[in-house]
């Protein structure tokens, strides 16, 4: 089964997402606070007043950034998981999950698996099958000095080269090495 991941609007059925509009308003307020801070820096006030205004605006901006992080991370990271069968047809299972809670659930499942004796390779790659090596156990390398390339040949291929050569005794550019 293949899993397809789609990003969702966090407020389905609405033209404008409430969370994104809230973040936009917060950004506008943050920009206004920064402008006020810059204006107070330019006006002829004493250093103590400038320091107090700058500290207050920095605190407001830090609070705004924290609110943006809370709203943005918890409400905008919604995804939809849908399973595809072998023919590429969607199954009816559609689950909307929060990415953070999904990651926390995976960590809990991994901790449960650590207590059990599980083959690590099968746990990480359950769909892989063991394959037999395709290279022959006994093989020869043919090294071409002209092109500086090495070729892996079987005994049958070497016999065919010797039979099909015009002059098998005159092959100074090819060197055959046996490897076991």
From Swiss-Prot:
Q: How does it sit in the membrane?
A: Multi-pass membrane protein
Transmembrane stretches, by residue range? Answer: 16-36, 52-72
Coiled-coil boundaries: none
Which compartment or compartments is the protein found in? Host membrane
- Decide whether keyword Transmembrane is in the record: yes
Query: Which InterPro entries does the UniProt record give?
Result: Seadorna_VP11
Q: Which GO terms describe its cellular component?
A: host cell membrane; membrane
* Protein's recorded name: Non-structural protein 4
Source organism? Banna virus
Q: Which gene encodes it?
A: Segment-11
């Amino acid at each position: 089964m293949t899993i397809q991941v789609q990003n969702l609007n966090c407020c389905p059925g609405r033209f404008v997402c409430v969370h994104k509009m809230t973040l936009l308003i917060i950004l506008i307020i943050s920009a206004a606070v920064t402008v006020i801070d810059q204006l107070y820096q330019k006006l002829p006030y004493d250093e103590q007043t400038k320091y107090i205004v700058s500290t207050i605006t920095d605190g407001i901006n830090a609070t705004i950034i924290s609110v943006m992080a809370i709203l943005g991370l918890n409400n905008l990271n919604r995804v939809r998981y849908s399973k595809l069968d072998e023919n590429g047809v969607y199954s009816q299972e559609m689950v909307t999950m929060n990415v953070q809670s999904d990651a926390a659930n995976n960590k809990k499942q991994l901790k449960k698996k650590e207590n059990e004796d599980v083959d690590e390779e099968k746990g990480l790659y359950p769909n892989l099958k063991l394959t037999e090596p395709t290279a022959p156990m006994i093989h020869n390398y043919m090294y071409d000095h002209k092109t500086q390339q090495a070729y892996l040949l079987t005994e049958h291929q070497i016999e065919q080269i010797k039979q099909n050569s015009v002059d098998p005794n005159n092959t100074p550019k090819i060197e055959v090495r046996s490897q076991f």
